[in-house]
UniProtKB/Swiss-Prot annotation:
Native species: Chlamydia muridarum (strain MoPn / Nigg)
Name the record gives this protein: V-type ATP synthase beta chain
Family designation: Belongs to the ATPase alpha/beta chains family.
Pfam families associated with the record: ATP-synt_ab, ATP-synt_ab_N, ATP-synt_VA_C
NCBIfam families: PRK02118.1, PRK04196.1
GO BP terms: proton motive force-driven plasma membrane ATP synthesis
Amino acid sequence: MQTIYTRITDIKGNLITVEAEGASLGELVQIERADGRSSYASVLRFDAKKVTLQVFGGTSGLSTGDKVVFLGRPMEVVYGDSLLGRRFNGTGKPIDNEEICFGEPIPITTPSFNPVCRIVPREMVRTNIPMIDMFNCLVKSQKIPIFSSSGENHNALLMRIAAQTDADIVIIGGMGLTFVDYSFFVEESQRLGFADKCVMFIHKAVDAPVECVLIPDMALACAERFALEQKKNVLVLLTDMTAFADALKEIAITMDQIPANRGYPGSLYSDLAVRYEKAVDIAQGGSITLISVTTMPGDDITHPVPDNTGFITEGQFYLKDNRIDPFGSLSRLKQLVIGKRTREDHGDLANALIRLYADSRKSAERMSMGFKLSNWDKKLLAFAELFETRLMSLEVNIPLEEALDIGWKILAQSFHSEEVGIKEQLIQKYWPKACLHK
């Protein structure tokens, strides 16, 4: 039963307050304005009969006499195959100039998947980016952020991952996007040929902050249905979680909440965790793998958003100098697939390459300080140049097996086989034959 109220007692920012009974948190509300227009809101807080609503699209033009209708259900988004290839805003309305999308309405605020039905991740998600596939494998159901330094083109990296992944469906949630960013997503999805298996939920920088916080929920609600009902392997890409946290902060300040670290609400950790925990590998079903972008203001890893994120997720990719930094990046689930779902030489080769690259950084530092370089230093510097060009560049698009072969070739071009610290049985099997006795 719908309840109608005609008295708005307070309007502050995108929040309004009404005197109402029987409201529930997250309940969807329709506001019918005097000029005939209507907008939606959701219940954010209530204190006895005093109910605070966050209005989608802003409160401009509202008057205290407008009708407020409690719909008795939570915010919903349409689910179905008709979503594929479509783009929606933070309220679930199409923004691609196409017809209204028909499908099953599903609530966007549901609990995390039942832990009893989860299985231990054991399958790799391929991206054809060597710095991910080879050194920090992405595993089905993993939740992992990309920590992006200022000025890094993280959107291009996301589009590369979306285009090259072997996931069945890609769902993109964009928060605080400029028009240039939004246009880039649309154009790249069409140019790279994955638009037909992609769904986009987009919040632009000019849209209301309350719509920003709904984007992850909409994306993950649809992903969960695709994984559960259609047994699809879904890759969810969220950007930018710092913009999401800033929207939470703006709403909390408007509600006069006591701020915590750097003005963010004390619930920031829980607000992030409840979204990340949607990542799941379902027994007898599909999976949800979640990659998010978290920009670091001032390259500060101790900023509340990346700091809290690091405690929730299963590693991180550190994007710096237009590369995925091998020393700041980590996948805590990679041991579940390396050598088990990949070639036997994967783990030893990756460790040797990173160890030698770390040594080359020390040699580069000695060279910059004017020290005399040894023959070993020169070998390391030559190796580093090959490694950065052929494996570290984000422009490289090769499958894992080819990346492993290239890794062996780089070692053979730079070192003797006994200098790399790899097991003799692997050397005999994988070291390029022409260089075996080098």
